[in-house]
């Protein structure tokens, strides 16, 4: 088999199917992206799988991508996410966008904000639970 066929076989072994959207992209793109997706989205990494899916779900909510939301929700549940956790992710996703909108609407000075964030971060380091 050639590299493309090997990639398709690896996808099938991983997902049980080769999704049509993966066949629809250019072959060279799939051959390049699949190993990265498999390693960082599906494999062992420094971030546990469920948390990676939470990150993906929060991002997909903010970019309003129904495809991404569906995939990351299903994968989060498949990795043991509870309804309470999913609800918290939904809140956090909306909260980040909300505060971003407020800061932009206020036209809050970015240099001031940067200094304040550093102060907050230093305080968090000192008071973090060990």
Locate the predicted segments by residue.
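Acidic, glycine/proline-rich low-complexity segments that act as flexible tails and inter-domain linkers
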Residues: 1-51, 104-130
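Iron-sulfur (Fe-S) cluster-binding segments and ferredoxin-like electron-carrier domains
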Residues: 30-31, 71-85
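Amphipathic alpha-helical segments within well-ordered protein domains
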Residues: 38, 56, 73-77, 90
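Short, thiol/selenol-centered motifs that function as redox-active sites or metal-ligating centers
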Residues: 55, 59-71
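Short helix-capping/linker segments at secondary-structure and domain boundaries
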Residues: 64-68, 101-103, 111
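Beta-strand segments within the central parallel beta-sheet cores of soluble alpha/beta enzyme folds
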Residues: 85-91
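Short Fe-S-cluster ligation motifs
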Residues: 91-109
């Amino acid at each position: 088999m050639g590299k493309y066929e090997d990639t398709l076989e690896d996808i099938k072994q991983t997902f049980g199917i080769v999704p049509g959207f993966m066949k629809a992209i250019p072959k060279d793109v799939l051959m390049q992206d699949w190993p990265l997706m498999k390693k960082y989205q599906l494999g062992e990494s420094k971030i546990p799988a469920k948390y990676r899916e939470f990150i993906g779900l929060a991002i997909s909510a903010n970019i309003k991508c129904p495809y991404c939301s569906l995939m990351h929700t299903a994968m989060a549940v498949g990795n043991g996410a509870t309804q309470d956790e999913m609800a918290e992710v939904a809140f956090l996703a909306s909260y980040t966008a909300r505060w971003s909108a407020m800061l932009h609407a206020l036209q809050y000075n970015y240099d001031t904000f940067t200094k304040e964030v550093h102060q907050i971060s230093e305080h968090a380091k000192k008071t973090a639970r060990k």
